[in-house]
Amino acid sequence: MKLSVLIPVYNRRAALAQCLGALARQTLGRDEFEVIVCDDGSDDQPEALGAAFGSALDLRFVRQPHANRAAALNTGFHVARGDVVLFTDSDMVPTPALLEKHRDFHRRDPRPQAAMLGHMDWYPALPLTRFMRYIVSDSAWQFGYRALADGAPATWGYFYGGNSSVKREFLAANGRHDESFARAEDVELGYRLSQAGMELVYDASAVNYHNHFVTVRDFARRNQNVGRALVQFAARHPELTGHLPIFAGAVLARETERSGLSIDGLIAQAEAVERLELAPAQEAEIVRLYEMLLSFALGQGVREALQADFEGAPARVTVIVPTGRLDEPLATPLRDRLLALERGGYEFFLFQAGRDGIALDPTTSLGPEVLQACRAAAVRARGKYLCFAHRADLDDGRLARLEAAIAGEPEAGMVSERLAAGRDALAIPRPLFFECGGFAQASGDAAFGWRLGDRLRSLGYRPRELAATVPPGGSLAG
């Protein structure tokens, strides 16, 4: 059984040299593994290290124009010849038995779906700061190993790209890294592999050291990028929307800003106390400061992603609608109306409460649970505004009224229209829907009886209800 060790690198030649040196000292024989350096368009010529390590290692360099880690890893995977793929990073220093432990695991469990997670810790020679110790503590901002037992299964969220291995054929059959992800590409791959049956097991003795000094500022910016990736993650996998801190992050970011705090200000506070000697009681205060900063940074990244334009021409309004039977074709009048409205700058998500959904053209179904479906649709939406309506109320005049009202009165935060059947249709800016927590609970009408007004008023908005209208004749419900 042969291993392929994939190392993505971008302008880290010195760190890569240390990593390759540690790989050259492995207890596993040279002919039992190959090392593929996946160069993401570096300027510092990492391939020049081949002369120093080519005799000690079965070493290859593959290069691509600068893109991201995911693309670099996929480029390396294309040339991998091993039975097992082991992912690590250029700033890691493997302990001598690391590869042997991964190889032995896969020998003991040759099943295609069996995968292994090793342990990562700071490099012993690295000078650790208070902040660096904090992010690998129970806070789990960097690594979450303290929640794992040695030899126990680990969930897909632990599929860390710095020390994990999987059978090459299983990886080839079930998807490689998604190159649209600039961050969290390893965990996103782990989720897809877990859906295909991957069983990840943790070995605490398979240690890979992280030789990377981390500053407060750099890690806070990293957390902003994680927040952006969470939104992308939920858009790609809507079934996870309720399990990711997207709504909570957006709410926290807004509330922190309203209190007069900023990321730069919190970073400055954290940096100022980094070198101070503190009493135990003061240490607890510093932990709260770190937690506030990193949570705020993550939430700010969520907000930025929610406010950013999506690729392509975004719709003006995303309309989210509970529909009738999803196992029957849409009635022709409704289908024609949706197609016409889509051409006019609207997009639609339809779902049915209480049962599994199926894909519909030109719409997308979102599954059985109303709140979950609304959250998932909001994350995937491309529109500047969200409109929640009933399928019998998909009148372009009504949608146009709601859009014009919310666009013309941003201070309202939300506009709604009470319909003859006692239902509400409402429109709200997409980022604001997240910042006020979305639909927290249902009340009144089983489908759309939620009330966002109180939360919006607490944020200083003045929600407005439009004059009641009578639904047009000739229902489009079909």
Region annotations inferred by a language model:
Residues 3-15, 19, 26, 38, ...:
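A conserved hydrophobic helix/loop-capping motif in glycosyltransferases and polysaccharide synthases
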Residues 22, 39-48, 92, 325-327, ...:
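A conserved acidic beta->alpha catalytic loop
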Residues 22-32, 333-345:
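Short, acidic, metal-binding catalytic loop of nucleotide-sugar glycosyltransferases
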Residues 64-80, 364-380:
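Glycine-rich, basic loop-to-helix element that forms the pyrophosphate-binding segment
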Residues 85, 386:
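Short aromatic/hydrophobic "clamp" motif used to bind/position activated sugar donors
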Residues 97-132, 393-420:
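Conserved donor NDP-sugar-binding/catalytic core segment of glycosyltransferases
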Residues 119, 135-156, 410-423, 433-434:
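Short, flexible, basic/aromatic active-site loop/helix in glycosyltransferases
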Residues 200, 204-287, 473-478:
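Active-site-adjacent helix/loop segment of glycosyltransferases
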